Amino acid sequence: MVRWFTAIRVRLRDLRQSTFFMNAFYLMLSTFIVAGFGFIFWVIVARGYSSTTIGLATTLLSVSGLLSMLSLAGFDTTFVRFLPKSKRPNDHINNGLVVVALLGVVLSLGFVSTLSVTSPSLIFVQHNGWYIFGFTFFTVATSLNVLTNAIFLAQKRVRDIFIINLLFSAFKVVLPLLIIHGSVMTIFVMVGISQLVGLVLSLGVMKVRFQYTFSPKIHGDIMRLTRKYSFSVYASSILNLLPPTILPLIIIHRLGSSSAAYYYIVFTIGSALYTIAYASMQSAFAEGSHNEAAMRNHILKATKLIGVLLAPAIVVVLAFSNVILKIFGSEYATGGSGLLRLFAISAVAVAACSALGAIFKVTHNLRGVVAMNIVYAAGILGLSYVFIPKFGILGVGWAWIAGTIAAAMVGWAFLKRSNSNYKLREG
């Protein structure tokens, strides 16, 4: 017995000394904290707002999320890949912050100007100057907050991400307790304020940790150095984000705002499963960016970690999906439990795509990562459009499973054909 406890203690000590496992642990914990507090946030909101109001708010948040991700222009992945060995980290960071902020403003205003065509249900935003300002401002704040996370990951300071996310997520939960009733924009602004708090905290920590100093100057030589890589990962990121952000628009158009609310809540919960794979492979990506020669070992470690954690998590969701969703109300359990189970089943294919994506980004297999995400986006969105009239909201889940499996198969084909230095089976 003593030997057994000693062995466990030694193993835990080894894990604490491994930057890969600690970064993966903090990434998972950070995402679970955000998801957990987000879960509480929506439980509170669901008690004070109608499902129609929540459906419109979640659609607006989804669009804002898409625009904030589009604003990143690939800088988040580029930071993780190039910052570790950069001799001018401040210039890299300032390039990213300035370009992302400017692009965020342009995209947000562009979207608002086309609401009558792209999303008539959100046209109310266009009719109020403060709504336009709030939508633009908080979309930019969200994109910059996400970008700062990439900076901490690149420097292997993931513990800071966890602390910052814990603080701004806790703050987010307090807001609906203070503002019990309101409109669609009330919900949107509450989420936006929490993102702004996270951004301010991140910039403060960057100043202390990395002696970061902001400058609005764009350094063209650095932009030219990374533009091909940035453009390719930007394209793949756009494709990867299209399904979760465009699906609410399809659902609200074909099934109504209540179904959009069910989808948003279900996907928020289902994303917690995907976090296991995403966090593990992001940690492998960060470690591989510091030391490409060790990439194979990190991928294998990540795969083992995913296997240990993901299987029981899937079983729990499959068994208790109805119970979980009843927390939001019986209508959510009735309307979304089947979809949640399908999202859980797709987690295995999502993990495979995450692993392949990490390999492609480190080895600069840019065609592979773009092709895989083309199949992913086209498969999920195209099949959802076909399946929804036949299966209702469950059609989204079946499309998600088929699309991710197809994407993983395409990614595997590119890996097998790759001439990069990384070979999955080589030691």
Question: Could you describe each region identified by the protein language model?
Answer:
Residues 16, 21, 117-135, 257-258, ...:
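Interfacial segments at transmembrane-helix termini and the short loops linking adjacent helices
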Residues 129, 133, 162-210, 375-379, ...:
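Hydrophobic alpha-helical transmembrane segments
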